[in-house]
């Protein structure tokens, strides 16, 4: 559904500013945590933040003076104004080294140039002929400022950054003025396009330094265009490099010229990329049709989709959005309360935390997101080629254009292959390059450099995050120990192309070695994309049943009922009321004895049952709602904002958002390519120029088709247009009486990407094709609910039993054990091996109540998640009761899990090797140097960690930065409707635990990685590809599945065997990441703490001895004494006490159902009721 049109007022402004700021005015302690800078280059990229890099009153959306038109017979000038917004980052080109580098890794520029040469992407050179450089020192001198005491950086409109790179702008010193940044006076010099001196020119000026250009009016005083070498090199790396890699265009200047032309000619719809675009040579699979023709069509689809993506990205760059640039004063993380929150990991005792430390703790959370996209083989960072599934056989009935023929694949390992022209002829200068065959390949430094667009600043920022990815701790391979690697390389004098002995700890190769457990690149196949995005709204439908019984579904047409009354009957409102009731009753919080525990179970049962009964009766009796039919229309939904300022925490997050946008736009364009190419003379010389507008219009027509939403924005111009007088020099004051017209008054602005996941799994209708039927059959086994006995600790009450085990069963500990152990107790109990003498009458009653509850819940459970809190249990129970009312059977539903990023101070020396700054004397000195870093933590020494929650709506309410898998399906509407609709399907990230330790491969579950923003940078407002992890995580998973009375001992032994001495540094968060169980993690941390208590110090030998002692403790010490019969427990007595009333048969005294269940229209009562024998 299209959004309502919006009217925005903007003021006329230049296309950019050069800020000259005193170095002392910069908050360098904060910039050091946000900037992207390489240690071997003074240029830097920093976020555009009001109060940090620009003044507090800076306006992010403007009407850029983009040129001039002649009007009237007298040849008067009218300025051409283009709506635009400023780029979310600023570019330091003078004294950028006043800010520390993002990473101390040496020679990153050398690494980028080496990878660029290997993969055939063009190197930087002066963008135009006869360029005259304007240095930062010269700018300072023109303003009368000391060059060595000031830093200069560019703030530029998003649509015109390529125009600045191509020297199509000039500095207007006459319009320079001062602003206040951080209480200091800073100068800013406006940048205007040279087109002011070339009326009616709506194209890129190829030779801006030619003062004799025929387009320049005779009476105009033409200025010197602005060219700065470090700035252009920076724009070449950060702006052009990622776009070139994403669009497979190896000539970066061609990308710049195309984007700059679109900035000046808003009506251009034809091709913007040149005809000499090259393509990667790789073997195409033999499918239907002629292979040669297929290769030509694949290459044409590749370049046309890239062209369309650049064209539509220009539309996004010229958009006017809702949010203004972030303001430093509005970041709660920097306020006093925010600092305590942000630094909670370090300030557990309530000690004050500096703003820099709080911000350092927060930005380290984002390391989990960046690492996920680096470690996931289906990440948008690696979508570097276009593949062809082959045209359908024309002899078959119904053969025609397909949405799925062309698609992007993750194939960075093919980038070094020879290159061809559009006809498939290999270029001579690349013919000697080896051709890599498709398949699995090792991930190398060059691939990471390519993913970063060969930009050393961006590479340094990504390394900043990878240095904070501590997931390598959980792999269980000794060869990834960074301390051992550095020590060994010092002894062996291992040669490295980037570092020497002194800089070996900080070397990028050291960081990648520590994280080398990343999966190999997957085979070339169609798969979902791993994308980055931002939740800009606190609203999402991520409850267990998604948007079931939503406001839109309940509202009747032409009904005047107040919206508030309708909202009260929705599923969302029912969940809110239930959670409020559970929280108000404090169920499970104050358990002090057996009676209190059993009362809590009864209270929970009654609360959930009453909520479900009230909800369903209201829908059926009052709303005449079709419960069962609506269930199959329910979806989990969320929206990712395309607002450029929402995800601009740092240059790396802006980069990830851009790569995601380019990947999505190309995915849409590729789906239409077959329809454009079908039956056309693709080999024709003018084919692209003729059909590129057709493809562009088709992609634009897909907006508001279910996936990418857009809205119409109407722009009005504020009074007063200030611009240079072209008849005077650039040092003269601007004129204030210009006339101006907006180039576009109303235009489409892209808003969001809508992501959804169907709640129900369906085997489909009879109209499915054979291939679709086979896919559904393969999925059915994964969704089939197994018919197995309920495991109490892994059931609905497992978390409560672990939490209150010491209170309820203080004698439930193994012989010789020091503390009650729920794993030992319930394992022996369910195996009928627990001595009956250890149990009292209260114990037995509680055990019977727990068993009945667990069995009753398991009989109706179709949510393939184990609750970890009372709120999760209440939500799952409510959803299961609703599913039972709808007569749902057989299959699990799709479930969501949110993995929230956290941060902590590191404890493992291997995690801090990259932060060692002093020279190492010898191999033995490596660990000492690492411990010195641990003992003296800095503001930026944090590492990322994770925590999971199944209450995803609360996670999404924090408006987080997110990473998730996304697949886009396309389909036509109803018969006779040719419009193409899409669905953004929630999918997975390939790599499993390599991506995040808490992720598992389960087709019934979808994960989202989230870094919260609310409370930090904004205020509160009203299937994988089958890759498996066979390291420590898989081993632990097997141990937990096998169970046993002392499962924590087996897990601890496995971890000790895999990690050795590093086990000493594991904290409760680390143990939780390994076992994904808060209470088991606490038991493992307690075992780890007992090691040092034995001999006064921790050692591997002492830990192994403790493990042997624990393994020697037998499950039962009673010899021949009678064991408690768990199977018979609960077979008699008050069975109805904990069974849901709707499940209790009438003969046992429950609520008697009516003779005919007309209320729910779901058949006769005997077919719905569970008998006592079934229970």
From Swiss-Prot:
One of its GO terms (cellular component) is host cell nucleus. InterPro entries: DBP_sf (IPR035989), Viral_ssDBP_head (IPR043031), Viral_ssDNA-bd (IPR000635). GO terms for biological process: DNA replication. GO terms for molecular function: single-stranded DNA binding; zinc ion binding. Its main location: host cell. Plays several crucial roles in viral infection. Participates in the opening of the viral DNA origin to initiate replication by interacting with the origin-binding protein. May disrupt loops, hairpins and other secondary structures present on ssDNA to reduce and eliminate pausing of viral DNA polymerase at specific sites during elongation. Promotes viral DNA recombination by performing strand-transfer, characterized by the ability to transfer a DNA strand from a linear duplex to a complementary single-stranded DNA circle. Can also catalyze the renaturation of complementary single strands. Pfam families: Viral_DNA_bp (PF00747). Homooligomers. Forms double-helical filaments necessary for the formation of replication compartments within the host nucleus. Interacts with the origin-binding protein. Interacts with the helicase primase complex; this interaction stimulates primer synthesis activity of the helicase-primase complex. Interacts with the DNA polymerase. Interacts with the alkaline exonuclease; this interaction increases its nuclease processivity. It is found in: Host nucleus. A motif (Required for filament formation) lies at residues 825-826. The lineage of its organism: Viruses, Duplodnaviria, Heunggongvirae, Peploviricota, Herviviricetes. Residues 1151-1175 are annotated as: Required for nuclear localization. A zinc finger (unnamed) spans 496-509. Keywords: DNA replication, DNA-binding, Host nucleus, Metal-binding, Zinc, Zinc-finger. Belongs to the herpesviridae major DNA-binding protein family. This is Major DNA-binding protein.
